[in-house]
């Protein structure tokens, strides 16, 4: 395991496919990928599970293995370290290139550890990505052992980031169990995602305009929450905005509860089945938020 991690070489190979036909794979060695997992895991554990970040930064929602769209986001927002980034999870599954996607993100995490941040999504969990594509991609292109190494890394990802004490960011949403930020800080890592409770909800819950208070979630996991839950949470914790991902939205971003919550989704033409745009939210020094949109590519006539 004495392989020295040549980050520069790894990043340059991952970026070499810019402008190539979308879908061209980058085949790193298994040792290099294992090295990315181990080194990033070390950094993730050295940083808190609840990140306290400063603006300016750019926030991105689900990527789901759409590697060429991730590259488009960086073309648009600036490649690190030109801008600071926070990603809200769901890097793997469903898309064709989960490996390239997660490898580039982990490489940037290692190289720019204080300016580049990755939260955990519900797909950064073995029981989910075992089913929705990542396991199969690891097995086909490398080994099951490598998939297990990724699991060990994902189990150490942080779950919440608060930007300038005002913007609460997580993958899914709020939890009926969440009364103090200290509860989040007390979650010990490494950890799997449980079937219920605080950590589960932060990664799985959804806002819902028809819910008053807390409701059942059609996903069969966690809850839905209404606008009033958002308002009370923000007031109680002196926050301005909840920023989350986890749901496809047509324009790439969508507000809820009178603009007190925003959903971001950064994978345009999701799975090739939707005509949605992807969006990235830029937060400036004054905490003004603006959106950069990746338009969906016109569907080619078959």
UniProtKB/Swiss-Prot annotation:
Cellular component GO terms, alphabetically? cytoplasm; cytosol; nucleus; protein phosphatase type 1 complex
Which note does the record give on the cofactor? Binds 2 manganese ions per subunit.
Q: Where is the active site?
A: 123
What this protein needs as a cofactor is: Mn(2+)
Q: Which GO terms describe its biological process?
A: negative regulation of BMP signaling pathway; negative regulation of smoothened signaling pathway; regulation of glycogen biosynthetic process; regulation of glycogen catabolic process
Check the UniProt entry and state the signal peptide residues, or none: none
Tell me, what is one Gene Ontology molecular-function annotation carried by this entry? protein serine/threonine phosphatase activity
Q: Which reaction does it catalyse?
A: O-phospho-L-seryl-[protein] + H2O = L-seryl-[protein] + phosphate; O-phospho-L-threonyl-[protein] + H2O = L-threonyl-[protein] + phosphate
| CDD domains attached to this UniProt entry | MPP_PP1_PPKL
The record ties this protein, via Pfam families, to:
Metallophos, STPPase_N
Residues annotated to bind Mn(2+) 2: 90, 122, 171, 246
Task: Give yes or no: UniProt keyword Hydrolase.
Answer: yes
Q: What are the protein's UniProt keywords? A: Hydrolase, Manganese, Metal-binding, Protein phosphatase
Concerning InterPro entries, the annotation shows: Calcineurin-like_PHP_ApaH (IPR004843), Metallo-depent_PP-like (IPR029052), PP1_catalytic_subunit (IPR050341), Ser/Thr-sp_prot-phosphatase (IPR006186), STPPase_N (IPR031675)
Enzyme Commission number(s): 3.1.3.16
Q: Where does Mn(2+) 1 bind?
A: 62, 64, 90
Highest taxon of source: Eukaryota
Query: Subunit details for this protein?
Result: Interacts with Nop17l.
Q: Which family does it belong to?
A: Belongs to the PPP phosphatase family. PP-1 subfamily.
Q: What is this protein called?
A: Serine/threonine-protein phosphatase alpha-3 isoform
């Amino acid at each position: 395991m004495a392989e020295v991690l040549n980050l520069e070489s790894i990043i340059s190979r991952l970026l070499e496919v810019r402008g190539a036909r979308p879908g061209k794979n980058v085949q790193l060695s298994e040792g290099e990928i294992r090295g990315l997992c181990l080194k990033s895991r070390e950094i993730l554990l050295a940083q808190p599970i609840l990140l306290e970040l400063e603006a300016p930064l750019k926030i991105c929602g689900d990527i789901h293995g759409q590697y060429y769209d991730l590259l488009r986001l960086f073309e648009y927002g600036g490649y690190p370290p030109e801008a600071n980034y926070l990603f809200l999870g769901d890097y793997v599954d469903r898309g064709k290139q989960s490996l390239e996607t997660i490898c580039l993100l982990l490489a940037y995490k290692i190289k720019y550890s204080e300016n580049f941040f990755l939260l955990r999504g519900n797909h950064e969990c073995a029981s989910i990505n075992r089913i929705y594509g990542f396991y199969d991609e690891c097995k086909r292109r490398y080994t099951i052992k490598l998939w297990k190494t990724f699991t060990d890394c994902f189990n150490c990802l942080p779950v919440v980031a608060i930007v300038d004490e005002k913007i609460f960011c997580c993958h899914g949403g709020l939890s009926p169990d969440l009364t103090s930020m200290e509860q989040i800080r007390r979650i010990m890592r490494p950890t799997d995602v449980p079937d219920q409770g605080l950590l589960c909800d932060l990664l799985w819950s959804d806002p819902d305009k028809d819910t008053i208070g807390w409701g059942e979630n059609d996903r069969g996991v966690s809850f839905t929450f209404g606008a009033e839950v958002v308002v009370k949470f923000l007031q109680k914790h002196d926050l301005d905005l909840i920023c989350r991902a986890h749901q496809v939205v047509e324009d790439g971003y969508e507000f809820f509860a009178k603009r007190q919550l925003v959903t971001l989704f950064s994978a345009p033409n999701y799975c090739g089945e939707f005509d949605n745009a992807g969006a990235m939210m830029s937060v400036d020094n004054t905490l003004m938020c603006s959106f950069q949109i990746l338009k969906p590519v016109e569907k080619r006539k078959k």
